[in-house]
């Protein structure tokens, strides 16, 4: 049985290009033959590479690989063991942050299109934060649409870090602003106020907004 302390899960991706493989070596083993390639069922042959129970490849190129092992004893060469491993050392590319059309620049929630590319292991997740807030994990949906939480008016910065399935990452940012609602204006008001009379005010404010009045006695 072949194991790998550096690439233990045959279905996972790793950003380590120096895989290590171990196997048990019984006392009667007289020869070991190993090979790594891109085929799942390669026969490494019948020429012994020596007698050893571990091997460390160096600077293996990115991609999906298979490690092949064959052992020999006095009875000849045994069956071939195959072990798959995946390497991806290149970060994602083409991180694009696009501010979606905004009909209302004062709206506290802002939508972005967030996309990235990874040709080897594939994009896994995004870590997104606004300004200096804690980041949240976001998984891309079908339309690549990310919507912020409700934000206060003013300038903001969208910070995005995209990870591939091997843990490599690429960061990007985009500045945007939320416009403040214009303050309501009082156009006319009575110069004298009596406690037993209705107060009538005239003013201007955006449609469908709630205006709260506070009266303060000097």
Regions found by a protein language model. Give the residues of each.
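Low-complexity, disordered linker/stalk regions enriched in Pro/Thr/Ser/Gly
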Residues: 1-217
